[in-house]
Amino acid sequence: MKLKAVLLGILTAGALSAGEVSVAAAANTTYAFDEIKAEFAKLHPQTTLNVSLGASGALSTQIKNGAPFDIFMAADMKFADDLHKDGFATAPAKTYAKGKVAMFSVRGVDLSKGLEILKDPSVKTISIANPKTAPYGTASVQAFQKAGVYDEIKGKIVEAKSIGEALSQALKASDVGFIAASAMYAPKMAKDGCNDKPCKQGENFVLVDTKLYEPIAQGMVVLNRAKDNAEAKAFYDFILSDKGKEIFAKYGYEF
């Protein structure tokens, strides 16, 4: 009987420690999330982590309309802070990483010429994320305007729903894509866009001068439905931990 009681106690404790965390995350974090999920699972093997990726504005709208998320990881501070101001989050946003914009092409475009190459007649299509809903799209337009090329190239711009879709367009159809630099550090991109070699700065992509766009500080909030969710708090703390920063740093993010 004592053995049964002990076993029952162990099983009950295991059941109590199990749980789920639903995360809405900006599409630029896609590649980093493979490693984030793996490392978090090592620390919390009983927790199921569900991740939905998309444009920050679209995810924010879903949350306001009742989508059942516990954590929101935006591509900027505004979308995350606005959820707190509007009463959907438990506390103001905290910055978990700072992203960069990269110019990428698989069409042999001479990226060494910088944004000026976009005016060349050979460049007919330029993919960016929707600047109304995706902060990386906003940053791309800011860069075009500050560099003085926007008026001449605006007719070439193709807006994607998210930064992930902008990358997909750059791989499949567009001459140039303005994407999250994090994608360029992902092993998967070596196969998809860099001839089975690690993507090389100056060859496969160039970083857009950060002086041309507002810093992309990315904010995270715990949403109200997770205020008593210990697993959600554990994930939030993990993202802000040294290990979380180590993972993001691998993908070119800064802090």
Question: PLM features: residue spans?
Answer:
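Exported/periplasmic ABC-transporter solute-binding proteins
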Residues: 18-43, 52-53, 57, 61-65, ...
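Gram-negative bacterial Sec-dependent N-terminal signal peptides
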Residues: 1-17
